[in-house]
Structures are given as C-alpha cells and as structure tokens.
C-alpha cells in the first residue's frame, strides 16, 4: 500500500503537521486534508463502520463512492463478520481487500494471523462475491467487473478479494480469458502434445506457483498437465446450484451445464485442486466434477516457519501436488504404482507421515 500514500495522501483534517523521515524518497509518507486514504489503525470495528458509511453513501447521500477496505484477512470475517452482514443488510457496495491471505503465504506469524478460511466464511454472506486471484491481470479484471456490477448493472454487492504478500512473476494477460475469470475458472495452459497420460491441475492465489512446479515434476515422469486458474470457487458453486435448480424445475428440457462442468467435466481425466485455504474451499465444486477429484488445502492451525517448510508441512507444495496427480493416475489405471513409489522415494516423503489435522 505504500505507493498509494504519496499519490493519494492519508486523510488528515489539518493536513501534514510535520516532516516525515522519508520525505525525500519517492514513496514517502504523506498526510493531506484532501487525502483519500483513511488510516484507522488497529480498529476493525471502526474501520468497517467507516467502510459501511462510504459503501452506502450512494443511497444515503446520493453520492456514489467505491470504497476499498484493506485489512489483515484474519481480522476481516474472523473479527467483524456481523458488521459485514450489517453492510449487506444496508445494501452496501464496495471492495473488501483481505490482505496477507493464505495459511502458508503469511509465514512466520503462527496460528493467530495465518488465514485459511475467510474465503469460506465470505461465501456465507449472500451479498458477497469472494475471489482468490493468482495474477495481477486477474485482480484488475475482477475489480473492473465489480465496479460494473455496482454502478453499471446497479447491483448491491460486496466483493471480497484475497490478496497476498508473496512476490512472484506476473505473466501478461492471455487472450480471451475475461469470461472465465469472472465466472470463476479458466484454462491457463493446455496440455502439450504427446502420448502420456493427462491430469488437470487447478490452482489459485500464490499456490499457482506450486502448481507450475508440479507440472515440471510430472513432465519428468511423462505426465502431461492442463493448468486451470480458479479465481472463485464460490462463484462456480453459485452458478452450479442455480443450474441444478433450473434443471430440477424443467425436467422435460435440455439440462443447463454449469461453467465448472464445462471446464472439468471429462470423467476420464483426474483433477487436482490445491489452495492455500482449507480444503473445503475448492471442495465446493466437487459435485460438478465427474472424474477423480483430489483436493489439497491447509486445514489446521497455522505455524511459524518459512513458506517452503509450511507448504511441505501442509502438503500443498509442488511435490505434494505431483504425488496427488500420480496417485490419481494409479487409481485410474493410467500408470503403474511403481511410478508413484519411485516419486515418493525421489521426493523423500513417507506414506506413514502423521495427518497434521489430527489434534
């Protein structure tokens, strides 16, 4: 958020009354009577109330605004879900930015701060659309879509977006992915040509990097991968349930096929979905995935360690994703079990490792 300080200024009724120590640098701390940033400190209830005031000003003052409330994601729905429900009840419009998301991405802060469930909690609020973008172009597309929903389509909606603090390469936006981003999933990269078995790998947030690592590991065993980016399991589920309802009410007409089924419906190809959130998040689409579906998530309390160690601990790193794919292929009869055993030995992983979700 630091670049925003100098450009937009932190709101202060009397302006800046002192010279900050970083006043000579480009991204300096700047307060202004015309500042657009409200810095509320460790005051979740007060900050959320300020957000509600701005998010409802289109109706209370006939003055539309687009508020962005950025916070430690663990202290969003975990702390003020009742206020967010109140915001929805007041037909608020705006963006809730769950920064420092991910049970392994915010490393080193233990069980108090490491959030792996806010996306699940967000889905309980009927006015909230919950997103988990992996790349900058996904984030930009989601924000543009959100503003259009609020003030183009005149919908009273809130958009919760999981944001992370891990640096990794941001690719250019591929052609023709806007619809998939908004509907919750799109094909990032198809399987290369060849004769080897195919798996479908689904990633979101920074764990997409682990998915890409798994692709390389699987290639070493002659396995080809399709890569999907899941920007919103909640939106996929919402549409899936709507299609199920329509089909139930119109039994004599052709069935509607939800987007997730169009993406992952081939029963012959195993699907592996991995997330830096609880397994229940990607598991929201299970009923529309017809093939062998494996979900990897971060159930349990957080830990203080490096990201690499945490992702090994929660079994969501590239090795875990690759092993899950190989296991599914053994189950489907596409490869021999000796391939899986060879990979286990190569990665130094034991089948007798304790389930960390057990207390």
Positions of predicted regions on the chain:
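Thiamine diphosphate
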Residues: 2-124, 130, 138-144, 212, 282-283, ...
